[in-house]
Amino acid sequence: MEFKKVAKETAITLQSYLTYQAVRLISQQLSETNPGQAIWLGEFSKRHPIQESDLYLEAMMLENKELVLRILTVRENLAEGVLEFLPEMVLSQIKQSNGNHRRSLLERLTQVDSSSTDQTEPNPGESDTSEDSE
């Protein structure tokens, strides 16, 4: 497996997600303190996809350097707070989710097996109901 490649791609995805969360938090704050700038941020975010966080921030640098600095600060603070808990939390949630999916799959497999067995093998002592109705 390519653990290093997967880790790098995961880090990029997490970076973009933390940028999104920072923008969301700042937008909420601005809606209370500076509604005009909150509207501007919303419009900017519609024009520039935040999924590519580095491109998003580079585009914003051309229009609003102060807001970029605020996003960078909030994103870094979020990262510091989240990354402390993340490894253990992710592993725990994946193990729990995998267990739930395996249990569900096993239940479905046993239901399919028992229903196909019921259809092919009549229970002893049961008579064919079509003969009784004649």
Curated annotation (Swiss-Prot):
It comes from the Bacteria. GO terms for molecular function: protein folding chaperone; protein homodimerization activity. Induction: Part of the rbcL-rbcX-rbcS operon. Residues 111-122 have a biased composition (Polar residues). It is found in: Carboxysome; Cytoplasm. GO terms for biological process: carbon fixation; photosynthesis; ribulose bisphosphate carboxylase complex assembly. Its main location: other. InterPro entries: Chaperonin_RbcX_sf (IPR038052), Chaperonin_RcbX (IPR003435), RbcX (IPR046381). An RbcL-specific chaperone. Required for assembly of the RbcL8 core, acting downstream of the major chaperonin (GroEL-GroES). Acts on newly folded RbcL, has a transient dynamic interaction with RbcL and is eventually displaced by RbcS. The central cleft of the RbcX homodimer (RbcX2) binds the C-terminus of an RbcL monomer, stabilizing the C-terminus and probably preventing its reassociation with chaperonin GroEL-ES. At the same time the peripheral region of RbcX2 binds a second RbcL monomer, bridging the RbcL homodimers in the correct orientation. PANTHER family: CHAPERONIN-LIKE RBCX PROTEIN 1, CHLOROPLASTIC (PTHR33791), RUBISCO CHAPERONE RBCX (PTHR33791:SF1). The homodimer has 2 functional domains, a central cleft essential for production of soluble RbcL in which the RbcL peptide binds, and a polar surface which plays a role in correct RbcL subunit arrangement. Homodimer (RbcX2). Interacts with the exposed C-terminal peptide of RbcL ('Glu-459-Asp-468'); binds 2 RbcL peptides per RbcX2, stapling them into an RbcL2 dimer. A slightly longer peptide binds with a higher affinity, but no long-term stable interaction with RbcL is detected. Contacts a second RbcL monomer via its peripheral polar surface. This is RuBisCO chaperone RbcX. It comes from Picosynechococcus sp. (strain ATCC 27264 / PCC 7002 / PR-6). The gene is rbcX.
